[in-house]
Amino acid sequence: MKKVLFILAIIIVIVGIFLVLRPRVSASKGATDGGKILVAYFSATGNTKAVAEKLADATGADLFEITPEQLYTDEDLNWQNDQSRSSIEMASRYSRPAIASKIENIAQYNVVFVGFPIWWGREPSIIDTFMESYDFAGKIIVPFATSGTSGIGDSGANMQSLVPNAHVRGGERFPVDVSVSELKTWASEQM
């Protein structure tokens, strides 16, 4: 009986040491391993921008707008017109609209939230351009989207295929009126 108690005590001590010494991820530091957080977003109508600003506020992140070289007009965004710019871009998985804005030092970020509206059940092609424009190896990528009714679909899987050495989360769709506290809770679960 004494042997059993002795072995049990040793196991408890070992587990206790493991729990005390294990590395921790702290959202309050701004990211894992002391790195920073970036909220990058593309917003055609302003809804994703509104959520991105709240998310940056909730996480203490830097904010970056993914701006297309050629801005989208209302006609470009007419999803009911098969000949609209957005319809043509989304018809091909290989479409890569040019981006006018650039992140100077992506290496400083360990966590990158990437926001976008849902187009045709997935991320817009300009997000694919963004994902292929930087080295995201080892970074946590967290998609978030805005949409009236559509879910985020397979956007996370699509993005993971573009940056196979990153850790892309499944992502979430939010209404434009999501609160900062809701975003803070969600974001802390992603990092």
What are these regions (language model features)?
Residues K3-I7, G16-M191:
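Active-site-proximal alpha-helix that buttresses catalytic centers in soluble enzyme cores
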